[in-house]
Amino acid sequence: MNFLLSWVHWSLALLLYLHHAKWSQAAPMAEGGQKPHEVVKFMDVYQRSFCRPIETLVDIFQEYPDEIEFIFKPSCVPLMRCGGCCNDESLECVPTEEFNITMQIMRIKPHQSQHIGEMSFLQHNKCECRPKKDKARQENPCGPCSERRKHLFVQDPQTCKCSCKNTDSRCKARQLELNERTCRCDKPRR
């Protein structure tokens, strides 16, 4: 289904491009490869928006959050990272092939020292659109004990077993008995 949808998108995009393409003589390009005041063609925008490795400036502190005693020069580095669109909200652009790159960075310890050292960073070599991982499902793979009365239950994250927060002795101290199905202290049945 996704393949068919992608094929239809591409076909329509190509048709639109061919229908509206204007052949003009080459004019001097501005910085960034575009002519001044030129409208970027649909196919160019469409092709450049796909999930792929793209140069991204990454803050060094994002990669090395524990190195707070240093000031880095430069403070960010250009890395190839996955970016772009997947044309389906249930998919996300993720790396499928990665490698480390070593860069020389100046590490400054204010009022003490500074030196150029080597630091390793992760680069993305290949990217792919894959189903999004459900964050909530990853954090808690167990289903809820009760939709309406979650506050009455305790759940073991290892076994997913549900047990009552209330205890039988706590209920009996109030002249009630524990209903293990609802985890409430109910009036005794006669």
From Swiss-Prot:
It comes from the Eukaryota. Disulfide bonds join 51-93, 82-127, 86-129. PROSITE patterns: PDGF_1, PDGF_2. Keywords: Angiogenesis, Developmental protein, Differentiation, Disulfide bond, Glycoprotein, Growth factor, Heparin-binding, Mitogen, Secreted, Signal. Residues 1-26 form the signal peptide. SUPFAM superfamilies: Cystine-knot cytokines, Heparin-binding domain from vascular endothelial growth factor. Glycans are attached at residue 100. It is found in: Secreted. GO terms for molecular function: chemoattractant activity; cytokine activity; growth factor activity; heparin binding; protein homodimerization activity; vascular endothelial growth factor receptor binding. The keyword Secreted applies. The keyword Signal applies. GO terms for cellular component: extracellular space; membrane. Its main location: secreted. Belongs to the PDGF/VEGF growth factor family. Homodimer; disulfide-linked. Also found as heterodimer with PGF. Interacts with NRP1. Interacts with BSG. Interacts with CD82; this interaction inhibits VEGFA-mediated signaling pathway. Growth factor active in angiogenesis, vasculogenesis and endothelial cell growth. Induces endothelial cell proliferation, promotes cell migration, inhibits apoptosis and induces permeabilization of blood vessels. Binds to the FLT1/VEGFR1 and KDR/VEGFR2 receptors, heparan sulfate and heparin. Binding to NRP1 receptor initiates a signaling pathway needed for motor neuron axon guidance and cell body migration, including for the caudal migration of facial motor neurons from rhombomere 4 to rhombomere 6 during embryonic development. Also binds the DEAR/FBXW7-AS1 receptor. This is Vascular endothelial growth factor A. It comes from Bos taurus. The lineage of its organism: Eukaryota, Metazoa, Chordata, Craniata, Vertebrata.
